[in-house]
Amino acid sequence: MANKRNYAKELNILIETFTHEEKRPTLLLHACCAPCSSAVLEKLTAHFKITVLFYNPNIYPEAEYQKREAELKRLISEMPCTKEVALVDLPYVPEEFFTAVRGLEHIPEGGERCFACYKLRMEAAAKYAAGHHFDFFTTTLSISPLKNAQKLNEIGEALAEKYGVPHLPSDFKKQEGYKRSIQLSADYDLYRQDFCGCVFSKKEREAKARGEA
């Protein structure tokens, strides 16, 4: 069996290399929400010229989408380390999500439906990064203990090959990343949602709260 890759270590080695070479590459960072972005931005802004991409057609309902988008904008405007960070928000088209997960609606959270959602959002990031000549792209998603970092990186590497823009390896939950995101969320009084985003995860969460799952 092959050794499991340490994506957090791979990222640290890249950062050390860029620092030694006095390089600060451009990075398109797909962001799912403000809490997950907080610790990632704090870690990366000194080493990359970052543009944040908010593309999350999975989020339900639209009011929830708008709330998360507004919190991300507020975070970027308030963090001292994000003065140079740009934000791009792509149109909110929920049908893109439903098309991507068609036939997977009843698969439990954390399975193939989620992987299809990862790919949908990361592919939008890869396309944008390639079209705008970024040095790297990645996503904040791996900061969550509920997200499969190996799958995220495998998807990222496949998209890198497809679109010709390198994927930045990451497992942001490691090295106290998730713990730091909780602290920063408290520091900035960020809205922390209690479900991943889609209507299916919302229903699952509500069922668990009622003791039905």
What are these regions (language model features)?
Residues 1-39, 47-213:
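Nucleotide-activated chemistry modules centered on ATP-dependent adenylation/adenylyltransferase
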Residues 44:
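Aromatic pocket-lining residues of Rossmann-like dinucleotide-binding sites
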